[in-house]
């Protein structure tokens, strides 16, 4: 889970804090609607998005886990949920992951906390959610 320096969401920061709630429809790279606007996408309710976050920037569909870093979009990450602020690739550090194929926010964003190999920071199989407003 060692990530390059950049705009990643780290410890003490929620995903919501990086976006404004203005703007129109949010869509995936394949143009499928995620929510009618930023407010709906970023809010804790409703509990479902219109579609899942299961499409990569290249248009590939995925079902594997994705690094999330916190329990919800509105919850700030901690060093224990973000692989030490995404700076650790050690098997003794952990990060929270979600399931991008789910449109249920609680499952998509952080379905798993500390669960052995699934969330150990040396796991190179997980992708990272990337949102652009």
Task: Tell where the protein language model's regions lie, with residue ranges.
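Secreted/extracellular ectodomain signature
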Residues: 1-133
């Amino acid at each position: 889970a060692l990530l390059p320096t950049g705009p990643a969401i780290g410890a003490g920061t929620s995903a919501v804090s990086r976006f404004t709630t203005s703007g129109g429809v949010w869509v995936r790279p394949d143009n499928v609607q995620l929510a009618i606007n930023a407010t709906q996408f970023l809010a804790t309710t409703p509990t479902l998005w219109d579609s899942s976050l299961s499409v990569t920037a290249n248009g590939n569909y995925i079902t594997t886990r994705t690094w999330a870093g916190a329990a919800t979009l509105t919850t700030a990450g901690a060093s224990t949920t973000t692989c030490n602020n995404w700076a650790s690739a050690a098997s003794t550090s952990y990060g929270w992951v979600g399931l991008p194929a789910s449109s249920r926010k609680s499952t998509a964003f952080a379905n798993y906390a500390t669960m052995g190999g699934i969330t150990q920071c040396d796991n190179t199989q997980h992708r990272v959610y990337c949102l652009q407003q």
